Swiss-Prot record:
This is GTP cyclohydrolase 1. Its EC number is 3.5.4.16. PANTHER family: GTP CYCLOHYDROLASE 1 (PTHR11109:SF7), GTP CYCLOHYDROLASE I (PTHR11109). It is an enzyme of class 3 (hydrolase). It comes from Helicobacter pylori (strain J99 / ATCC 700824). GO terms for biological process: one-carbon metabolic process; tetrahydrobiopterin biosynthetic process; tetrahydrofolate biosynthetic process.
Length: 180
């Protein structure tokens, strides 16, 4: 890691021995371990260990779960909120497990579209609900800091499975709950 940063500092014209930079390689290495710890965790385990047989057959919504991730194209952050709705069949998941699922997938190099899809597909596979919907809203620093430089742009993605995809009324109910 130190060799990488020494080359990086040289390439941008910076003095690697400058006081403020001496510990930077170590600090960044620790930061990267934290930012990308999602590679060392299995998202399926997070859900499998946190569900129980339930009697609820109405919609359950976990709204505005904050996340941050790193764009795999530019290695810059993107961040925002994810909302997950589902209609149980037999399994109800602990609410913190939804946040954990989001955290595991977001702590990897990502694109927003794949992040949204991975959350929905894993939830659908493990919990087997009658339907699941995932909506992700994010700001991308790669869009704000370079290229088109649009600081206020918000990107929205959604993935729908089961009843949310088949039934417009179910989808509308979820969207109404997000507004309230």
């Amino acid at each position: 890691m130190e060799k990488f940063f020494n080359q990086f500092f040289e390439n941008i014209g910076e003095d690697k021995n400058r006081e403020g930079l001496k510990e930077t390689p170590k600090r960044v290495q620790e930061l990267w371990k934290f930012l990308y710890k999602g590679y060392k965790e299995d998202p399926r385990v997070a859900l499998k260990s946190a569900y129980f047989q339930g009697v609820c057959d109405e919609m359950i919504v976990a709204q505005n779960i904050e996340f941050y991730s790193t764009c795999e194209h530019h290695l810059l952050p993107f961040f925002g909120n994810i909302s997950v709705g589902y209609i149980p069949k037999e399994k109800i998941v602990g609410i913190s497990a939804i946040a954990k699922l989001i955290e595991i997938y977001s702590k990897r190099l990502q694109i927003q579209e794949r992040l949204t899809t991975q959350i929905a597909e894993t939830f659908d596979e493990i919990i087997e609900p009658r339907g699941v919907i995932v909506v992700c809203e994010a700001k991308h620093l790669c869009m704000s800091m370079q290229g088109v430089q649009k600081q206020n742009a918000i990107i929205k993605t959604s993935v729908l499975r089961g009843l949310f995809k088949k039934d417009p009324k179910t989808r509308a109910e979820f969207m109404q709950l997000l507004k309230s």
